[in-house]
Amino acid sequence: SGYTECLKMGFKEHQINRVVPNKRYQLHGMNFETVPAYNVKSQYHPKSSNWVGYILEIRSASYYISGDTDMNEDNVLVECDVAFVPVGGIYTMDSVEAAKFVNEIQPRIVVPIHYGAIVGTKQDAERFEGLLRNTIECRIMM
């Protein structure tokens, strides 16, 4: 679990805050909400593991960091200004699936992630960008 991994890295128990899906939290003055992050077609990230993405509220904007996930019945309800969404495929959505997801939730800005190292390429990010509605700004960072 993430908790165990944090302990192995040297964090103390009092430094670790456990979260569960579908909850709102406030930590050190920051408000955030957890969103279930899981795969629908594969079992790399099963729903039963209770992994999450986050919606952070910073100033007057909301930022969704999806985590390793596919489009699913939980995250399709996300409302945000900026979304960070995986496009690399295999362990997460591929570029086509990610574009379908982002076109559904309609953030103002999207940043494709989870490509270019382990899986996926810059071409995946570019393909993703080409499939977005013209009302959604895409920022490819690498």
Description of each model-found segment:
Residues 1-17, 79-84, 106:
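Active-site metal-binding motif and surrounding structural segment of the metallo-beta-lactamase
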Residues 39, 88-90, 115-119:
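Short histidine/acidic/glycine/proline-rich micro-motifs that form metal-
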Residues 14-22, 76, 97-99, 103-142:
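Binuclear metal-ion centers of metallo-dependent hydrolases, dominated by the metallo-beta-lactamase
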Residues 82-103:
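Active-site-proximal segments of metal-dependent phosphoesterases and phosphodiesterases across multiple
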Residues 6-10, 56-57, 74-79, 130-133:
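Alpha-helix C-terminal capping segments
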Residues 7-11, 26-31, 43-45, 92-99, ...:
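Short, charged, surface-exposed secondary-structure boundary motifs
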Residues 18-78, 93, 142:
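Core dinuclear metal-dependent hydrolase active-site scaffold
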Residues 1-2, 64-67, 83-88, 110-114, ...:
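Active-site neighborhood of phospho(di)ester-bond hydrolases with catalytic His/Asp-centered motifs
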